[in-house]
Every structure is written in C-alpha cells, then in structure tokens.
C-alpha cells in the first residue's frame, strides 16, 4: 500500500488534474519516498498522454532536510507521528533505504508510464540537462521541457531554488510547479526568482503551494 509522508494531497491532485490542455505531459517528482505523491500525479493524468519521472537516490544517504534554525534541533517523526531517536537518545535525521524503493516499486507496478532515476537532483541535472529520453508508444523522444514538477526532496532554500531554476529554464507556458512543506524554507525567495520566468501563484495551502507559468497574456 502506498503511503505519503506529507499533507494536502487533495491539492496536489487538483493541480495536476487542472493542467492546461496539451498533446503530451511530462511530469516529475523530486523526492519519491514511498511513492504516494507520484501516484496522485499519475492518477490525475492517466486519461491523458503522459509520462512521469521520479528522482530519488534512496540508499540511506544523509543530507540537509530543512534550513537550520539557530538553537533548534529539528524533530522528525515516522508515519504514525512518533518522534525518531538515535540509540543515544538524540534526535534522528531520517534517511531512506533501498528497501523503501523496492516496496514502492512493488506497489507501483500498475503505472507503466513511469521511470525512477535513483539519483540526487544534481546528478539528474548533470545527466539530463540537454534532455531526457522518453520511450513511449513506439517512439523515442529527447524531451527538455516539463509540464508539472512536484518539489518534495531536500527542503532547504538553496536546494529548492537550484531545482526550481533548472526546471524553470525547461518549462512551457502553463507548466505548474508544486512546492511541499513551504514553511521549512524561504518560499518567498523562490517565488521572487520564478517571477522572472513569468510564474505566478495559483493557490497556496498550509503545506503546499502551486505556481503556473503564464502564457504571456495579461492575467486577471
């Protein structure tokens, strides 16, 4: 059974479902974990020509999850809300093992228009900065424009900004960006940077926010 470690998946579903019409959609999620976010996106694109990419290194690697706050140690919880501790009693920073990847892939087998790249975001950018090959309906296409991006990997301002700028440079009019856990980093810095690419606010929840790239026409 697929599980999510975030909130407001109903908003994620709505924002994916209401994408502007086009012949083909390429979506991506950074930070797949157990796959529920990717599942929600694909369920709402299943009646359209689409392909979805998941990016997550797994492998129990450690990284900065959120912007540090002086004097405050972040407390992480499991899916049941229990605080995670190390054996010495200190707060534990979560990692995501390869076994989680296998659990996710087993539960995700009905989604055929999907590929998982077991990479860090920067490694994906280095590998596919000139486009990613998509094999779909008997054709190979090198695609370098994305229509829907869910940012749910590292939640630091620097990391999210780097990711957002990569995809902003590879976006289409109507492309939507969804940001998760927006209270853990300086989301205003992200939105200000993306305004230069004509991204504007569609909707903001308590946990998630959606921006869309303008088609160049004046917005009401």
Q: At which residue positions do the language-model features occur?
A:
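S-adenosylmethionine/decaboxylated-SAM
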Residues: 3, 10-220
């Amino acid at each position: 059974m697929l599980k999510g470690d975030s909130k407001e998946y109903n908003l994620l579903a709505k924002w994916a479902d209401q994408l502007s019409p086009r012949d083909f959609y390429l979506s991506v999620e950074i930070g797949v974990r157990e796959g529920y976010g990717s599942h929600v996106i694909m369920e709402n694109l299943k009646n359209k020509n689409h392909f979805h990419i998941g990016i997550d290194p797994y492998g129990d690697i450690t990284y900065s999850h959120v912007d540090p706050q002086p004097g405050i140690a972040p407390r992480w919880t499991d899916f049941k809300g229990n605080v995670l501790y190390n054996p010495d009693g200190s707060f534990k920073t979560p990692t995501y093992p390869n076994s989680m990847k296998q659990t996710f892939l087993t539960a995700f087998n009905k989604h055929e228009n999907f590929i998982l790249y077991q990479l860090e975001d920067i490694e994906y950018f280095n590998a596919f900065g000139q486009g990613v090959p998509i094999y779909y309906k008997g054709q190979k296409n090198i695609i370098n424009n994305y229509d829907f991006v869910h940012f749910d990997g590292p939640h630091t301002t620097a990391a999210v900004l780097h990711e957002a700028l990569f995809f902003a440079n590879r976006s289409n009019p109507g492309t939507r960006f969804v940001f998760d856990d927006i209270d853990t980093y300086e989301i205003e810095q992200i939105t200000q940077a993306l305004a230069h690419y004509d991204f504007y606010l569609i909707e903001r929840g308590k946990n998630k926010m959606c921006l869309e790239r303008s088609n160049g026409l004046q917005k009401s």
